[in-house]
Amino acid sequence: MDPKRPTFPSPPGVIRAPWQQSTEDQSQLLDQPSLGRARGLIMPIDEPLPGRGRAFSVPGEMPVRFGRGITQSIAAEPLVGMARGVRLPMEEGGFGRGRGFLLPTPEPTVGIGRGAAIGPVPTLDIQKAEVEEKMPELQAEVAPTVAKVGSPGTGSSLVSMFRGLGIEPGKTWGRGAAPVGRGAAGDMGADLQPKPTIIGASLTPEREEVRSEESISFLGRGFTGFGRAAMPHMTVGRGPIGPLSPSPSVAAPFSLISASSASEDAPVAPGTPPKVEVKIETVKEPLQKIGTKGSPIPIGSNYIPICCKNDAVFQYHVTFTPNVESLSMRFGMMKEHRPTTGEVVAFDGSILYLPKRLEEVVHLKAERKTDNQEIDIKIQLTKILPPSSDLCIPFYNVVLRRVMKILGLKLVGRNHYDPNAVVILGKHRLQVWPGYSTSIKHTDGGLYLVVDVSHKVLRNDSVLDVMNLIYQGSRESFQDECTKEFVGSIVITRYNNRTYRIDDIEWSKSPKDTFTLADGSVTTFVDYYRKNYGITIKELDQPLLIHRPKERSRPGGKVITGEILLLPELSFMTGIPEKMRKDFRAMKDLTMHINVGAQQHTQSLKQLLHNINSNNEALSELGRWGLSISQEILVTQGRTLPSETICLHSASFVTSPAVDWSRELVRDPSISTVPLNCWAVFYPRRATDQAEELVTTFSRVAGPMGMRVERPIRVELRDDRTETFVKSIHSQLTSEPRVQLVVCIMTGNRDDLYSAIKKLCCIQSPVPSQAINVRTISQPQKLRSVAQKILLQINCKLGGELWTVNVPLKYLMVIGVDVHHDTSKKSRSVMGFVASLNSMLTKWYSRVTFQMPNEEIINGFRVCLLAALQKYYEVNHAFPEKIVIYRDGVSDGQLKTVEHYEIPQILKCFETIPNYEPKLAFIVVQKRISTTLYSYGSDHFGTPSPGTVLDHTVTNRDWVDFYLMAHSIRQGCGLPTHYITVYNTANLTPDHLQRLTFKMCHLYWNWPGTIRVPAPCKYAHKLAFLSGQYLHSEPAIQLSEKLFFL
């Protein structure tokens, strides 16, 4: 009972109905009719029974507490409360509302819907003996469809529902248990009511006084037991129910006790085994996420259907008495009882999963080896899971890893590779290991094996070999150069195929040093590798590499901390060398083996499936859990979204199938351009010719694009040192404050010079800047095309607008958010925030915030959002009505955090603006996913066209999500982007969300085509990358309305 709710005592001389007392006193009388919530069929009954109506009558001026009717004095005969305020006198008996059907009864009986009113219905005159005679037949008909569930024990959640109501769990309360409707109402007369017997309840004098008063009132949605819940004396529903009105000689089915004693055990017959609560996991209803716009097409994916032959997986809780702390001891004790549990188990120390059902409670005995203590092991059934339950997925993946090992694949990191199929690139001293990344997922379409082709690039050179090369090149700064080269990189030790990240180099130690083993013995590194791996260490004076693993627990309770020391001679570099990334020919040779097309990709998948299904040992391992993997790749129906129209200043056109409009962009004027009247070019003396040629080309190509470019201020530098550039730029900006743009022509890829220029132009003296590598403008045949692209980028940085698409939503703000890690302080991260300022989505506002690991990202997000809203109001003289946020950098495990923490904080931001409640859609953008899509036709797999969307079968069961491939693929497979709608009050349907997202992928002005993510996300990424990689500080606020970071 709500303590804040006022009490209304009954008028003197009026007796309150016993079922009304149960509401006020939080207890129920023993011999009164039981109240249930059956939605079953209507059966004949022997006397009027109470239901629940939404209207009722009360005597005199007594305050109305229940229902929605009006107050009226009551005559001798009762009135029935009809639906929502309709009152009707009845001569005898009554009826309630029936939403279903009424079975034929000895006399016609009427069921009525909401709001209907009917005249009196005669009370059915059926003797109890007649009902009792019919009971066995009715039970026999119902029994086959009723599942038997034991009555709950003390700790049952079913019992807790009634705790505090004074009801002892002597019988199961099922949904359809009680033969009375949804509640009690009316007054049957004092002479008809059974005398209450209170067991274990203590009533205060005030309560006793209230009970002695007289009252007539109605509670519930009906009057008699006709309608939703009336039933005869029968056991229907999810548990056994005793008779409705037990005779005084029969024990009552329920004992009424006080709230303080509600948790006592129910009396059970001698010899009855204890009952435990077993939960059955329910199947979730699918979410409405499927769109209809676009052309249907067949789509293939790297999802392989998995069939579960078992009916269920059974979850047990294992208790050790006395307690056993060591996990390894627990595993050993459970292994001794495999004859009971079976050979197929999944056990984590306390939760046990089996594919077979044991008794509800099983007691086993074991002996602790350390002190010979006898341990009692209690295995109690707690939950019955469908075989596709999310709780089963982790140990299904363990089974899958065993299968991959059976096939001869080696686990490196999280993926499996085939060392027997290695590809040697001798010219580049590289090895490519082909392999697979695999996982089992439960999606909207069921249980699937997700397989992706993976490649591991290993170098033939060990870390020691690279150290020798560095020593030959720079002996003076040898250790510093080694630290720059190795710290942060990933190495593999081939004696165990494990990968490690190098965190530091220990120069003071060598393989001749000793270390302590797990058993306490001391040995040298040389002896350790000779005894355990048969490896002879050749270089005895090499330093050691340090790997600091993240603190984590291993099975057995052992916590891994400290450092792992590795030998450079046995550690091999992984990944593509930085020098090789800049070598076009070397990268072309490598990508031939890494970037496989759709047909080759699917062939690799089919080969793996064939290997699994043709290996008896692998099939046996899967069959232990009732799993079987199909040999066919999933093919389902997707859609291709309609093409978009690109709008320039005075021209518009529909995109081509390749979604590339670079020709139209340089042929027609942009939406708006900024005249380049005062700008400066800085270049070293040896790049004078290239600088002059570039300025001339700017003048030739600017006209057709709608730009006006004046002659720049030329500043020739005597050298290309960083100090020379910075001093010259600072001097020029000081002497000529009207400079709109700084262009720097640099020789080579120099991060230090680039960072210094950007810090000066983005923080100290805010002005848009353009850095150009001299190699980019050194080829005359490509100079015109390069100049056009640079001019378009410059126009964006100055505040110009290039193109847009038609977005029908007015007063819309689209926001992009991405997070990047600051390279100067590895623990610090930077968030880029970009928001649109106009309905055409061509004006953007950008901000940056830095935060430490223990600081929530939402703190800086709130500041950026309020600033963007204020700027939007300054531009439009109104706040946006709808806000769509695209949030990048969120993994599946962080979705609930975003939903329960970030979004409420965003909503609180809106409360700071009076009378402002915008509609919000929050969409998470995921690029690093394992899903691959293929076009399919004539038994041939290809690359999907841009605009391909898939919003069912492979989607997440818990969210409204879809996969969209917005960009054009020239080589490799179709890698879509996953969009998850975490929050949506903007009334945007799945079609709206998909089409808006596709439109936003057209608006990245650095590329005249579609990109993989929405443009605001890409802008936010570029801004966060610039700030975290080079600036290490927030850019000046003067640049916030320009895309200076492109």
Swiss-Prot record:
Coiled coil residues, start to end: none
Knockout-associated phenotype: Progressive loss of germ cells due to apoptosis from 6 weeks of age.
Catalytic machinery residues: D818, E856, D888, H1021
Major localization class: cytoplasm
Annotated region described as Disordered, given as residue ranges: 1-35
Cofactor(s) named in the record: Mg(2+)
Keywords: Biological rhythms, Cytoplasm, Developmental protein, Differentiation, Endonuclease, Hydrolase, Meiosis, Metal-binding, Methylation, Nuclease, Nucleus, Oogenesis, RNA-binding, RNA-mediated gene silencing, Translation regulation
Composition skew (Polar residues), residue ranges: 19-31
Enzyme Commission number(s): 3.1.26.-
Residue span(s) of domain PAZ: 462-575
MF (Gene Ontology): metal ion binding; piRNA binding; RNA endonuclease activity
Post-translational modification: Methylated on arginine residues; required for the interaction with Tudor domain-containing protein and subsequent localization to the meiotic nuage, also named P granule.
Family the UniProt entry places it in: Belongs to the argonaute family. Piwi subfamily.
Description of how the protein assembles with itself and partners: Component of the PET complex.
PANTHER family named among the record's database cross-references: EUKARYOTIC TRANSLATION INITIATION FACTOR 2C (PTHR22891)
Name listed for the protein in its UniProt record: Piwi-like protein 2
Species name: Danio rerio (Zebrafish)
